[in-house]
Amino acid sequence: MSAIKETIDISRTPEEVFSYVTDPTHLPEWQESAVRVRRLSEEPIAVGSKVSVTRRMGRRETTMTMQVIELDPPRSWHVHGIDGPVRGDVQGRIEPIDDGTHSRLTLAVDFEGHGIGKVLVPLVVRPHVRKEMPEDELTLKGILEAGAAR
């Protein structure tokens, strides 16, 4: 299956958007399913950094470890799940628009299912994420444009 992709324009510079979205402690602020985030590596975030993310889908909470595998500030990043039955793969790209005063953010999310995850990914996870992602991007836009990320 192909990645779920969403794009949104944000009235903030690429540097501001990148700084906020790549700080994993902000995930519960703008992602509906993110319940808790715990850094497993020292700051600052870098290639190889690991983060534990707990998400709620329906009545169930699951925790997975995500690892940064690419980081190109302020343009792009790539994180990949390394454990759990459902392993997310998230790629983000930020393009400057309006002479760099605004940004176009594109997020692409895909999943690998392991064990029971092979059933959960197509039946539960992908439909949930397809619905949640556009709402999450609107929440992110609202937070950043309100200036909360500064």
Residue spans of the language-model regions?
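Short beta-strand segments that buttress and anchor functional surface loops
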Residues: 49-56, 77-83
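Beta-strand/loop substructures that line and gate deep hydrophobic ligand-binding cavities in soluble
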Residues: 78-135, 140-142
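Hydrophobic ligand-binding cavity/cleft-lining segments
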Residues: 1-41, 46, 139, 148-150
